[in-house]
Every structure is written in structure tokens, then in C-alpha cells.
Regions:
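Adenine nucleotide-associated cytosolic modules
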Residues: 1-178
Length: 178
């Protein structure tokens, strides 16, 4: 366990799945939020809760042979700026349906951990404002610029999402549990 490596480590166990009812309570004690969820409802929920709490969000995702990672900081955009609406149900297969190259979660997770260390220590340049794309088949990494969308329903100039919503309904019935 983590405590065997460092007895001063504090491990908080949350036995219930994250939801609109408990997300703000769960994340309130954390300085940085890291999301690697494999479903759209949870990704939108964690994004919205992080933004509403003013917490940095280090986000990563994988599917098949592709991965991506970014960091969302206050005032610099959010997941909804990148993906204003979820894809229609069934358009994007789940990781369980499509599969994932076994090494890819470790690659993206290591990038996310590096982002967290940079945020904690205040060093280096985070991925804020950039989306890192990984193509494991060609082993090419590239970045694309991300910008805050003034029309974003969450962080835009005239937000319409001002509280946590029913994310399963928003995502067309997809479950919060991947």
C-alpha cells in the first residue's frame, strides 16, 4: 500500500461513485483535481465541479491507440470549451467496447502526474492552453492550442451552467459508472 512506502501519506477512500449530489463535497479538500474517467458524464461532471470550485483540473483520456492530456486552469478554458456537447450515444465506443493499448494508461497517467508536480512546485510550463495528443501507433506526440470559448456555457462570458446538472441525461443516458 501507499502507507508502506510513506507512513505520512493520507489516503481518503470514497466508496460511493461521484455524482452531482456528492462531487462538490468530495473535491472540496483537494488542491488539484485529476480526472481519468472513461465516460462522458463523469468527465463533464468533474470538469464542472472543478471549475465551480476554482480548482485546477488535470485531465487525461485514452481510447484504442490514442491518448490526450491537458490541464485546465481558471480563466483559461475548460473541458466544455473543447467539447461543448457530448457525442451522441453510441457514436464513441467505450474503452470496454473498443479496447485500449495496455501501456497507454501508464503513459497518459505519467503525463498527468508530471502536470500535478509542476502545479504543486510552481515550476515549468503546464499543458494549460494546450491539448497533448498521443498516437501510440506512430509514437507521435503533438499539441494543439486550446482557448477559452467566450460562448462556453460554463466558463464563457454569459454562463448558463451555474450548478451541477444531471450528467447522465445531458450525455444521452450514458452512465456515470464506466
Amino acid at each position: 500500500t501507499l502507507k508502506s512506502y510513506n507512513p505520512d501519506t493520507k489516503v481518503n477512500i470514497h466508496e460511493e461513485p461521484i455524482s452531482s449530489l456528492n462531487a462538490m463535497e468530495i473535491i472540496k479538500d483537494y488542491d488539484i483535481i485529476v480526472n481519468g474517467a472513461d465516460n462522458f458524464p463523469t468527465r463533464y461532471l468533474v470538469n464542472d465541479a472543478s471549475y465551480m470550485s476554482g480548482k485546477p483540473l488535470v485531465d487525461g483520456s485514452i481510447l484504442l491507440f490514442d491518448g490526450q492530456a491537458t490541464t485546465f486552469l481558471a480563466g483559461e478554458g475548460c473541458y466544455r470549451c473543447l467539447f461543448p456537447t457530448p457525442p451522441p450515444p453510441g457514436e464513441v465506443p467505450s474503452c470496454a467496447e473498443a479496447g485500449v493499448l495496455g501501456m497507454l494508461p501508464g503513459m497518459v497517467g505519467t503525463i498527468q502526474a508530471t502536470e500535478v508536480v509542476k502545479l504543486i512546485l510552481g515550476i515549468g510550463e503546464t499543458l494549460s492552453g494546450r491539448l497533448l495528443l498521443i498516437d501510440a501507433l506512430s509514437m507521435e506526440y503533438r499539441t494543439v492550442k486550446l482557448r477559452r470559448d467566450p460562448k462556453c456555457p460554463l466558463c464563457g462570458d454569459n454562463p448558463t451552467v451555474t450548478e451541477l446538472i444531471d450528467y447522465e441525461a445531458f450525455c444521452g443516458g450514458a452512465s456515470l459508472i464506466g
